[in-house]
Amino acid sequence: MEQEQDTPWTQSTEHINIQKKGSGQQTQRLGRPNLTQLMDHYLRIMSQADMHKQTVSWKQWLSLKNPTQGFLKTRALKRWKSFNKQGWTN
């Protein structure tokens, strides 16, 4: 079986566990994360980014000063349509 070459991606995703034993340190490599761990990490990061976007959106919404009802309706419909196009990613 052919052994996988280290690439910048695989090197950056390797986990390193450092444990202190006595007066010295021992470094133990735990190997590469499996696909499930990578997907969990990706979804966690994307969820945090989505929360940030929602917070920014609400701050923009609250910062509007005396907008007309028609403007608010148009803005809300545009947001809703763009949200539905993106769909649920997590």
Curated annotation (Swiss-Prot):
Keywords carried by this UniProt record: Apoptosis, Host cytoplasm, Host membrane, Host mitochondrion, Host mitochondrion inner membrane, Host nucleus, Host-virus interaction, Inhibition of host innate immune response by virus, Inhibition of host MAVS by virus, Inhibition of host RLR pathway by virus, Membrane, Modulation of host cell apoptosis by virus, Viral immunoevasion
Pfam family, one: PB1-F2
Location relative to the cell: Host mitochondrion inner membrane; Host nucleus; Host cytoplasm, Host cytosol
GO cellular component, one term: host cell cytosol
Site (Low pathogenicity): 66
Top-level taxonomic group: Viruses
Span list, region Mitochondrial targeting sequence: 65-87
GO biological process, one term: symbiont-mediated suppression of host cytoplasmic pattern recognition receptor signaling pathway via inhibition of MAVS activity
Primary location: host cell
Region named Disordered: 1-31
Note: Is not encoded in all strains, and seems to be dispensable for replication.
Family, as annotated: Belongs to the influenza viruses PB1-F2 family.
Function: Plays an important role in promoting lung pathology in both primary viral infection and secondary bacterial infection. Promotes alteration of mitochondrial morphology, dissipation of mitochondrial membrane potential, and cell death. Alternatively, inhibits the production of interferon in the infected cell at the level of host mitochondrial antiviral signaling MAVS. Its level of expression differs greatly depending on which cell type is infected, in a manner that is independent of the levels of expression of other viral proteins. Monocytic cells are more affected than epithelial cells.
Subunit relationships: Oligomer. Interacts with human SLC25A6/ANT3 and VDAC1. Interacts with host MAVS.
Entry protein name: Protein PB1-F2
Lineage: Viruses, Riboviria, Orthornavirae, Negarnaviricota, Polyploviricotina
